[in-house]
């Protein structure tokens, strides 16, 4: 890497350059895909660029250089990483352990990909609550032979002392822009781990500044890029747009540490992605709010530097206003009922309503992103109102629920997936959608890029349309253009091999710019007080659609709502021949001054009339932002009572509507499920609940059922030694009881294997029930098991109680007592109806901390005490075990020979 004139700028070359020049280079033998298959790679055919990536990673490992795999989102960084593990274990006999840190939202995806691509590598998912993780820690300490440990950033920080105890061969950090701050707790904590090789995965290796880039470099190679030299790095490369020599040097510097490929270069077969911006008008209500927000704090415009926080707050409030005025408290009219007013109050939702109707009729499926979870709430109400099927993921949704939502969207014909850009834009694979809509834009364009990549990625077989909704003549225009300009600069430098952004602008300039941004478009926006929501021809803008696919590659027309062609490659503030880059237009400035003068006049008038000026920002539009300054009339007790009554009636009505909607949704889901079962010729073996049994069974047959068992000995538990899969029964039917989880995956060993030897039905029926979503906690599957062998008299049946939960991370819960009790109630009804005996293993045997005493009481309460002959089996593993079992039994627990 020797470069002519390396020290010409600033004298002595920085330490990181000198150290890099002296680094040795090791060579790794080239890896072929057949080698990886021989070592255990399954379920995937690596593309040529992915195989190149694996070889590059192997080379970095041999050089002992940590590195950054910065491929564009959707190109398969996960499979390349797993292939590296297979290479290390297969060729180098390096069996780890390997540590993977990732966001909670993709934890299950990593687990599934490990099982799919590398089933020969054992993978432990380190997740759960404090108690569950404590149990995992004990297991890992006693049996630490695993290849991969998978966990989240948050759990890593909580249990850092435990995870530090392992000598990690490889540390993988997914979505590694979390490490862009050298001073962050995660950066500092991971720097203390014992790691041979660090690998960072990020589709956005450069987001904002040189400092963030250096933070990633110092993490993967702290010896080369010391934290103290970040200033030297920034100073040396801050003007690379102007200095080609500096850019070339930085390119060479980064080559050993950063590999980035983009879809346009390596995935040419990937269907096309087209981006369209559609502009919308504003409702009269939105315009009123827009004015009021601007006038709420005039002081912020008079001293920009000192009032930066206030200006940012004004910008945030204006963006909320452009989204929907109902985001402000007290605006939505009472009683709170969903109706057309939702779309009439917002120009954005008015356009979205037309857009979704167009997409729904065309058979498209949509990812709908917003910055604000409150906006997602409004969109969710809208989806219910229009009857569109949807899933939702935002920052409040737990990992297990996220995985289920993603799975449902992939497997069922759900129309819309509602996502928050930050929480839903990372790591998810949602290629079932072919349309992405941004309700609002992120300040950081990389976040929107990641979000769009949920649909446009490897595995997508349809063209993808990305649609961005922008409020015309509002702050949204400037936010979007700033982001577009920033992204254009980033792409120019990264894809050119330069990998970085220029220096940050001075803070004062940014503040001045913000104060001007807020005035943009006022002349046109406030030219009238009425609504500017227009009807547009969506097909002419979006292009032709056929059979649920976008088929037109023509550029969208610039009519109606789109301005893409007008903008071209102009400056980000240059529209229609006017340059807004340094200051707003004369017309915008004049409109703002008129608003200010009007506000001051109203304030003076209010002062003269003796009104309180505490809420001076609300004078322009009373009651709109912080409440009215107008003195309220005191209501009489009767009027107060009447108002309270109306509010209670409205609340009760809304609750009824919600309950009715919930009931209808449950009925629709049940009906859909029944139709699905019927189409698959599936018949459920689930027992009904105690409440659903007919009264004649509960009452009329009770005497005859219980008179048969009047002997006191018959109402106590009987303990026997033997194999529960071959019940010691007389001529009556026998119900064999076994507890399973709700995953639908049949277990191995113990009673699972014994039942398979007895009958082929248990595995087949249980796994089919799992596929048909017929397993729920407290449920019981009951079916005969006499297909291989049977008694001369009486029938043997197996009752599988779903008493355990296995989450999406493959973590199995203990036996849930409530589910067990519910299952025992159902078994009682079945045994009573059949006049059968019940035969159970010692449930929870050898499970640490299991409450056998409580379980025994439940069995006695719901079975034996209610007249059902009930047997508990001790399985004799050896003669000594049988003798020990017999000697330790009390008189109340006599073994039945």
From Swiss-Prot:
Residues 351-513 form the Helicase C-terminal domain. Changing residue 457 to H: Abolished ATP-dependent chromatin remodeler activity. It catalyses: ATP + H2O = ADP + phosphate + H(+). Residues 642-654 have a biased composition (Basic and acidic residues). One of its GO terms (biological process) is DNA repair. A motif (DEAH box) lies at residues 174-177. PROSITE patterns: DEAH_ATP_HELICASE (PS00690), HELICASE_ATP_BIND_1 (PS51192), HELICASE_CTER (PS51194), MACRO (PS51154). Frequently overexpressed in hepatomacellular carcinomas. The modification Omega-N-methylarginine is found at residue 9. ATP binds at residues 71-78. Residues 704-897 form the Macro domain. Its main location: nucleus. Adopts an inactive conformation in absence of DNA damage. Binding to poly-ADP-ribosylated histones activates the ATP-dependent chromatin remodeler activity. It comes from the Eukaryota. Residues 615-673 are annotated as: Required for ATPase activity. Keywords: ATP-binding, Chromosome, Coiled coil, DNA damage, DNA repair, Hydrolase, Methylation, Nucleotide-binding, Nucleus, Phosphoprotein. Interacts with nucleosomes; interacts with the acidic patch of histones. Interacts (via macro domain) with PARP1; interacts only when PARP1 is poly-ADP-ribosylated (PARylated). Interacts with CIAO1. The macro domain mediates non-covalent poly(ADP-ribose)-binding and recruitment to DNA damage sites. Mediates auto-inhibition of ATPase activity by interacting with the N-terminal ATPase module, encompassing the helicase ATP-binding domain and helicase C-terminal domain. Binding to poly-ADP-ribosylated histones upon DNA damage releases the auto-inhibition by the macro domain and trigger ATPase activity. Does not bind monomeric ADP-ribose and mono-ADP-ribose fails to release the auto-inhibition of the ATPase module by the macro domain. This is Chromodomain-helicase-DNA-binding protein 1-like. It comes from Homo sapiens (Human). The gene is CHD1L.
